[in-house]
From Swiss-Prot:
Matches recorded under Pfam families: Beta-lactamase2
GO annotation (BP), single: response to antibiotic
Function: Has cefotaxime-hydrolyzing activity.
Stated name of the protein: Beta-lactamase CTX-M-4
Keyword Signal on entry: yes
PROSITE patterns cross-referenced by the UniProt entry: BETA_LACTAMASE_A (PS00146)
Entry EC number(s): 3.5.2.6
Length: 291
């Protein structure tokens, strides 16, 4: 099995196949996926990045997967996971209460705004951040951890040398083309999401909690989930920002198949461009076809 980085002009499907499949068949399959993703990207007018890991054999489908994209709210997975990691050595941590003040509220607070002048537990903040993309909840998690650099430090502890969180909500969503702040690559995020949800990065209880939060996400019905059969299980975290940046990262459980980890990042050249969740759904359908 070989591994290659894929730029815009190339997409490689890496797999261990039964001997009855010829190299010509593999080449044709790779070309088909490449052509479909290239056509999708061209029609969108934006920049698309995709990374999928098939955990049955660790084969990968990669498209522009080593270029940086603004993470936007997909970074909330790392912050929540960092708090879960802390809870491995403090069984009471997730019940710790955090004060919510009116001055804490930012641009999107569907859960936190209901608790102004009250408190939320760290567990409630994690659920709010991941399942409702509550930005105040994310900021409270970041503050608890000690700042954006501590979220980055947690990523480094997992072996992720690419992820970087520099700011809090909502400024981390500026997604300025070429700005390295608050970015990662599709491949790096896919590998880390796999480690967090299916690997050993978290203890079993904490890993199960993260998966539960992701499966309960309420914001992803038009993104990766829209490209999946209804019978498949999906846990995901969406994100959006300026320049029409539209993201979704997911763990997928196809019927009768090992899980897939899929990252889809998309951005556009105009600052006020509209989100394009349909592009993510289409990309997901392309790369999961045949499972």
């Amino acid at each position: 099995m070989m591994t290659q980085s894929i730029r815009r002009s190339m997409l490689t499907v890496m797999a261990t196949l039964p001997l009855l499949f010829s190299s010509a068949t593999l080449h044709a399959q790779a070309n088909s996926v490449q052509q479909q993703l290239e056509a999708l990207e061209k029609s969108s007018g934006g920049r698309l990045g995709v990374a999928q890991i098939n955990t049955a054999d660790n084969s990968q489908i990669l498209y522009v997967a080593d270029e940086r994209f603004a993470m936007c709210s997909t970074s909330k997975v790392m912050a929540a996971a960092a708090v879960l990691k802390q809870s491995e050595s403090d069984k009471h941590l997730l019940n710790q209460r955090v004060e919510i003040r009116a001055s804490d509220l930012v641009n999107y607070n569907p859960i936190a705004e209901k608790h102004v002048n009250g408190t939320m537990t760290l567990a409630e903040l994690g659920a709010g951040a991941l399942q409702y993309s509550d930005n105040t909840a994310m900021n409270k998690l970041i503050a608890h951890l000690g700042g954006p650099d501590k979220v980055t430090a947690f990523a480094r502890s997992l072996g992720d040398e690419t992820f970087r969180l520099d700011r809090t909500e909502p400024t981390l969503n500026s997604a300025i083309p070429g700005d390295p702040r608050d970015t990662t690559t599709p491949l790096a995020m896919a590998q880390t999401l796999k480690n967090l949800t299916l690997g050993k990065a978290l203890a079993e209880t904490q890993r199960a909690q993260l998966v539960t939060w992701l499966k309960g996400n309420t914001t992803g019905s038009a993104s990766i989930r829209a490209g999946m059969p209804k019978s498949w299980g999906v846990g995901d975290k969406t994100g959006s920002g300026d320049y029409g940046t539209t993201n979704d990262i997911a763990v997928i459980w196809p019927e009768n198949h090992a899980p897939l980890v899929l990252v889809t990042y998309f951005t556009q050249p105009e600052q006020k461009a509209e989100s394009r969740r349909d592009i993510l759904a289409a990309a997901a359908k392309i790369v999961t076809h045949g499972f």
